[in-house]
């Protein structure tokens, strides 16, 4: 089976600002637009440095990669697609990021059995799915005090 075409993702802030990494283009995977990421991370700026982050429905990895670039202590990426998960691993390797893990798994299944707690959880499920309310219902035990979703 051949790999699908690769798209390009630009990191917009932090230590890897302007670095380009690949993502698998397909299955509705689209990186969160630059403008949205910039706004999101402007809001989150005081909470990123040193945070332990869970990037659910990671897709291209854009949100978690931005968190690492901006000083997160650790990011756990959860992506069900094998090709997408591998592309995130390759991006992390290209960037030299050792403080991350990529788990190829269903987000809801991972939340149901996960024991670790996080400072910040990034949620960007597929647009046409009903996964957001289900994920939000499973989140409380995974969040540290004074957390962000």
Description of each model-found segment:
Residues 1-149:
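Class I S-adenosyl-L-methionine-dependent methyltransferase catalytic core
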């Amino acid at each position: 089976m051949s790999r699908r075409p690769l798209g390009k993702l630009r990191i917009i802030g932090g230590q890897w600002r302007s670095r380009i990494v690949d993502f698998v283009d397909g299955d509705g995977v689209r990186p969160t637009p630059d403008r949205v990421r910039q706004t999101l991370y402007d809001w989150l700026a005081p909470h990123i440095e040193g945070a332990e982050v869970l990037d659910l429905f990671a897709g291209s990895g854009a949100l978690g990669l931005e968190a690492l670039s901006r000083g997160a202590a650790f990011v756990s990426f959860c992506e069900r697609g094998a090709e997408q998960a591998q592309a995130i691993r390759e991006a992390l390797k290209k960037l030299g990021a050792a403080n991350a893990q990529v788990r190829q798994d269903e987000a809801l299944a991972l939340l149901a059995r996960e024991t670790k707690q996080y400072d910040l959880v990034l949620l960007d499920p597929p647009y046409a799915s009903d996964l957001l309310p289900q994920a939000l219902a499973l989140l409380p035990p995974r969040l540290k005090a004074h957390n962000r979703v």
